[in-house]
Swiss-Prot record:
<feature type="DNA-binding region" description="TF-B3 2">
    <location>
        <begin position="148"/>
        <end position="243"/>
    </location>
</feature>
<feature type="region of interest" description="Disordered">
    <location>
        <begin position="351"/>
        <end position="419"/>
    </location>
</feature>
<feature type="DNA-binding region" description="TF-B3 3">
    <location>
        <begin position="249"/>
        <end position="346"/>
    </location>
</feature>
<dbReference type="InterPro" id="IPR003340">
    <property type="entry name" value="B3_DNA-bd"/>
</dbReference>
<dbReference type="InterPro" id="IPR039218">
    <property type="entry name" value="REM_fam"/>
</dbReference>
<keyword id="KW-0804">Transcription</keyword>
<keyword id="KW-0677">Repeat</keyword>
<feature type="compositionally biased region" description="Basic and acidic residues">
    <location>
        <begin position="369"/>
        <end position="397"/>
    </location>
</feature>
<dbReference type="GO" id="GO:0005634">
    <property type="term" value="C:nucleus"/>
</dbReference>
<protein>
    <recommendedName>
        <fullName>B3 domain-containing protein REM8</fullName>
    </recommendedName>
</protein>
<keyword id="KW-0805">Transcription regulation</keyword>
<keyword id="KW-0238">DNA-binding</keyword>
<dbReference type="Pfam" id="PF02362">
    <property type="entry name" value="B3"/>
</dbReference>
<feature type="compositionally biased region" description="Polar residues">
    <location>
        <begin position="399"/>
        <end position="418"/>
    </location>
</feature>
<feature type="DNA-binding region" description="TF-B3 1">
    <location>
        <begin position="11"/>
        <end position="103"/>
    </location>
</feature>
<dbReference type="InterPro" id="IPR015300">
    <property type="entry name" value="DNA-bd_pseudobarrel_sf"/>
</dbReference>
<keyword id="KW-0539">Nucleus</keyword>
Amino acid sequence: MANASQLSPTNKHFFKPLLPGFQRNLNIPVKFFSEHIEGKHEGETVKLRADASKRTWEVKMDGNRLTEGWKEFVEAHDLRIRDFVVFRHEGDMVFHVTALGPSCCEIQYPQSISHEEGEESGEVEISEREVEENLQKEYDQSSADLNCFSQSVTHSNISNDLVTLPRDFAKRNGLDKGMHEIVLMNEEGKSWESEVRSRMSGQVFIVGGWKSLCSENKLKGGDSCTFKLLQNAKTPVFQLCSRIGESRFVKLTPTLNSLEIGKQHLPVSFTKGNGLIHPGEIILVDKDRVEWSMKLQVDNRGGMHIFGGNDWKSFCAANEVGAGESLTLELIRGGLSPLFKFFSKIEQPSFEAEDRRHKRARVHNGSQETDKGEPSRATKMGPELEKREKTAEKGEPSRASNKSSGKQGNLQKTQACSVTDHVAKVKESVVDTLTSIRRFQAELETMEQKLEDSLQEINKLS
């Protein structure tokens, strides 16, 4: 945690939970802005500092909103939705920023070191997030090629030019002890010299060449990629063989059953191609940029599916997607907490509309067959039907007319019922959405109270 002196009462501070859309800009609380900034400082730029590096970031301030330059600060510090940031005002429009993860613990960043310093000490610090992601990747390698491994790309591992290597993979290929020279190679054959190093804790990582490979192949934070080890050379070669961008879109068609039980299966080719092979949290963002938290689960056959209960149904309703209609999701971020964004709705008739269309087609085809010359029932019945028709002419309604009017009445009832059902479904979706929003607000309030309590405890220590 940040030390008590940094958060003492003499240093005014505020905290902000990071919600969807925070990457573009961030609002300074109105009360803090009016009491400590507005009218007290000239200029429209603030300076941000953090423990992650010695760099000072200049960010433009539009009113009480941080705008130009904020996105670069976010990317450099790998800030994500559900993180919290504490701004400590050090005076003269300078803020020290402390980042906290969803667990309210301070995020530990790697030290800014050079490769030469790393060689002398034999150790390189990496962020806790990368350690967690590395451990998660080691859970299941059985279904994949033993000479392959998947890796998440982050802004942090790009800027530090180093990336963790799954320990099982390193051990299996004799790369888990000491230092080994390797070559990183893309699919076109372009290569970069690099090294694999280990430390006392058992951690293994690739040092050097990573930043250049990502730049050359347009890999950026949030992407995932797969490497294959080529052992037919004196120096091990890690060849890039796939990336998330090649198959980041997936088409899903919810059924009545999947909407009711709140579960949607994902294509095996999509999940394996993007490294989505571990259960955990998953985030879906709808067309209005509202975030939905659900689960990524594994079924008995090893397939992956989204499970959200009523939230899955509400998510589809929010995007105006019904049973039998298709939607396309775009995978924005892989890793431990995959992020999907609604991309488009594929227009097609629902099951009920399709069924009605087939019924109309059958009726139409039947009339066409009669027109072509096939004898109708009326023709086959002959004199008996003529007798009934004469009776109808005298005033008694025929069964045919009764049946026709009966069908019209039933049709009107069906239409009325369909409208009622539709209204009920819309109402249910709205209620589900409101429930989700209220639950999220309650979680934020709880988190806010915890942070306030922590700050009070820190103030007491000072």
